[in-house]
Amino acid sequence: MIDADVIVGLEVHCQLDTKSKLFCGCSTDYRDDGPNTHVCPICLGLPGTMPALNKRAIEYAMKVAKALNCTIVPESEFSRKNYFYPDLDKAYQITQYDKPLAQGGYVEIEGDDGKERKIQLTRIHVEEDPGRLVHMGNAERGRYSLVDYNRAGIPLIEIVSEPDMRSPKEARKFLNKLRATLEYLGVFDSEKEGSLRVDANISLRGNERVEVKNITSYKGVEKALTFEVTRQKNLIRRGLPVERETRHYLEARGITQSARSKETENDYRYFPEPDLRPLRVQSWVKDIALPELPDARRERFVTQYSCSLNHARTLTGELKMANFFEGVVSGDRAGLCSLAATWIADTLAGELNYRNMGIDCVDPHRFGSLLAILRAGTITDKSGVEVLRVMLDEQLKGETVETPEAIVARLNLAKTAGDDGALAAAVKEVISENPKAIEDYKAGKNGAINFLVGQVMKKTRGRADPGELNRLVVAALKDGGQ
């Protein structure tokens, strides 16, 4: 249920996946290298240096703006945002202020009431990332901090939403949709550490706004906001004011902690960046080509592959999953569409999440082979899950992944036929072991049938066809349990 008193707006900082920094030629591939090895006089802000704008970063930002239905401003400009912090080597950040690259726009999500709704955007602007502090100990009690400027100058876009979200869950849905769109555009790599950071502004209607910083995960946004809603409501119930402030989210503890009083824009003393000309991009707009985006792909999955809307939404929510699905059903496996959608969205996704594996660890052709023998009736669904788990565990251990057919043969998982004497014997044995179930059946309790079917499935390790097994159990019960 939507909590009408909750008002949430997000400021989402996304690193653009360019090869070089925003204002210099330093590489952005810094994560596996030593500290301060991807720096130069420009990104360190040394005297006498001049920034040179990365055109590819602007093109990526414009592509995002177009995909999010924004109006691209014909002329924007960069400004200096002045504040002192150790990770800001120049003591100012080059960003955009009153003349951003794009304005307006929206992101469509499924609201908490199940209806599609538009989350309006305020603006999208381009800026440089600051460096990174490494606290020796922890941020509160460490003896000192180290500064790594490898990240300084990485191109960022900041996507600012209107305060249109009405729950922490809607905020997470907004972020998931935004992430999917950026991945489809090919401008963002969500798997890179620190590639997305969120500042969340939250208030309860009629009370002061609180900004929560230091949120670096999609789940973290929902958890941080849920904690903050509870904290603010508790203050109000006790008759205490909600103070306007900035709080940090401590992910390990799942709480927010007061950091400082919230700054106003005047505190940053913005003024135009004198070393960069105004940015005129009107002639570039016509060259922006968009790929198929998540909403369009979702609709295509419904019409082309007859996926349910829920399955299509899950499959297209991540670019890799959507590509995997189409890889599975390509060629002569078009008849597997419905089965593939169900197994990927419901079964495979859960097994991967349990093992903390990505879908790119799974070979679509091999997974398609598993679905093919399921569809042929060679194995039961329960045995299919067992085969899948063996395949994933082998992959996780770095072992050679067997084919589904080989696993079925090795573990003797082929479905037991209804005319197989072993199955009839298993039914007879289970019935003889459970006389109370026979009494319950005779008393009109049909739940006894399901119980006996389950016991036979255990005895046959899930190899019996449930429908055929149900028929055999009922026949045996009608025959007096013989």
Curated annotation (Swiss-Prot):
GO terms for molecular function: asparaginyl-tRNA synthase (glutamine-hydrolyzing) activity; ATP binding; glutaminyl-tRNA synthase (glutamine-hydrolyzing) activity. InterPro entries: Asn/Gln-tRNA_amidoTrfase_suB/E, Asn/Gln-tRNA_Trfase_suB/E_cat, Asn/Gln_amidotransferase, Asn/Gln_tRNA_amidoTrase-B-like, GatB, GatB_C_1, GatB_Yqey_C_2, Gln-tRNA_amidoTrfase_suB_CS. The keyword Transcription regulation does not apply. Its EC number is 6.3.5.-. SMART domains: GatB_Yqey (SM00845). The keyword Protein biosynthesis applies. One of its GO terms (biological process) is glutaminyl-tRNAGln biosynthesis via transamidation. Keywords: ATP-binding, Ligase, Nucleotide-binding, Protein biosynthesis. Allows the formation of correctly charged Asn-tRNA(Asn) or Gln-tRNA(Gln) through the transamidation of misacylated Asp-tRNA(Asn) or Glu-tRNA(Gln) in organisms which lack either or both of asparaginyl-tRNA or glutaminyl-tRNA synthetases. The reaction takes place in the presence of glutamine and ATP through an activated phospho-Asp-tRNA(Asn) or phospho-Glu-tRNA(Gln). NCBIfam families: gatB (TIGR00133), PRK05477.1-2 (NF004012), PRK05477.1-4 (NF004014). Heterotrimer of A, B and C subunits. This is Aspartyl/glutamyl-tRNA(Asn/Gln) amidotransferase subunit B. It comes from Methanoregula boonei (strain DSM 21154 / JCM 14090 / 6A8).
